[in-house]
A protein has these predicted regions:
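Flexible, processing/modification-adjacent segments and terminal tails
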Residues: 30-39, 46, 107-185, 208, ...
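Short, surface-exposed linear segments at secondary-structure transitions and domain or protein termini
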Residues: 82-89, 109-113, 130-135, 222-226, ...
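Bacterial Sec-dependent signal peptides at the C-terminal "C-region" and cleavage site
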Residues: 18-34
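Gly/Pro-enriched, hydrophobic low-complexity segments
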Residues: 92, 164-260
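N-terminal mature ectodomain segment of secretory-pathway/periplasmic proteins
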Residues: 39-118, 153-158
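Bacterial N-terminal signal peptides
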Residues: 9-21
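N-terminal secretory signal peptides that target proteins for export/translocation
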Residues: 1-6
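Short amphipathic beta-strand/extended segments with alternating polar/hydrophobic composition
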Residues: 75-80, 100-105, 119-130, 214-217, ...
Length: 263
């Protein structure tokens, strides 16, 4: 039997109806996944001390330390007044010059010193830009699970998978909408079902097609009412991120944000 031609108008109508049905199904599935992601994220935050403890945590201090093959290769000392946005970062730049930057993360304005001398012009601009980058990167390595519900963060449920070491993990996928310095980054946070602990994260930076990098989140300690992971070894790589001299306080220490005395 010869197949009868289907009128173009009917094809168009079927296409619209099918598209609408698929969109509705996809939307419902997406909403369900996002609701699951929200629930897991909230349970994770509750297990780490809860939002009331986060709201009370005004000042953070920490050293962001990079370890390669067991040896320290970089260290950046941070202080952050989360209420005002005032920030201090101290380290050594790529040329080996020690620097200090005092700025505000909201306005991105501030002052910089290199080799103890006030930076001006282009040098100042570069120091401020680099300091803001350190703020974005280094605080995220410390505080990522506390920032799951920040504006511009899209949280989706990416299924259940066996946890390394046993048990089951719920995996949360993080993507970003016009926030941060690299909004195309993707992160997957593995959360244990037993005790709701963040076990590790995987990430792909800048929309790359490379396999995800995995870093374990270990050495959890309670600081100022917040649970924080202080050790992040890379899986399959000779690198490790450590956090030292960590302190969380409900009040600001003004001396941390004061400019250095004139020589």
């Amino acid at each position: 039997m010869k197949a009868r031609a289907v009128p173009a108008a009917l094809l168009a109508a079927l296409g619209v109806a099918l598209g609408a049905a698929l969109a509705a199904t996809g939307s419902a599935e997406s909403d369900a996944r996002d609701a699951k992601a929200d629930a897991v994220g909230k349970e994770l935050i509750a297990s780490m001390g809860g939002m009331p403890a986060w709201e009370k945590a005004r000042q953070f201090q920490f050293d962001f330390v990079v370890i390669k093959e067991g040896k320290e290769v970089a260290r950046f000392a941070h202080a952050w007044d989360r209420y005002t946005g005032d920030y201090r970062v101290k380290g050594v730049d790529k040329t080996g010059a020690p620097y200090l930057v005092l700025f505000n993360v909201n306005t991105k304005q501030g002052r910089a010193w290199v080799n103890g001398v006030v930076a001006e012009g282009e040098q100042k601009s570069k120091q401020l830009e680099a300091a803001y980058g350190r703020f974005i990167n280094d605080t995220y390595w410390l505080l990522a699970p506390w920032k799951l519900f920040d504006p511009g963060v899209h949280l989706a449920y990416d299924g259940e998978k066996p946890c390394p070491g046993g048990g089951m993990c719920d995996v949360l996928k993080l993507s970003f909408e016009n926030v941060g310095l690299t909004p195309k980054d993707l992160y997957w946070i593995w959360v244990t079902r037993d005790g709701r602990r963040m076990l590790q994260w995987q990430y792909v930076l800048g929309g790359a097609s490379d396999p995800p990098t995995t870093a374990e989140w270990k050495d959890w300690r309670k600081m100022g009412g917040l649970m924080l992971s202080l050790d992040k070894p890379m899986v399959g790589q000779p690198f490790e991120i450590r956090f030292e001299n960590v302190a969380v306080a409900p009040a600001r220490d003004d001396s941390l944000f004061a400019p250095p005395a004139a020589p």
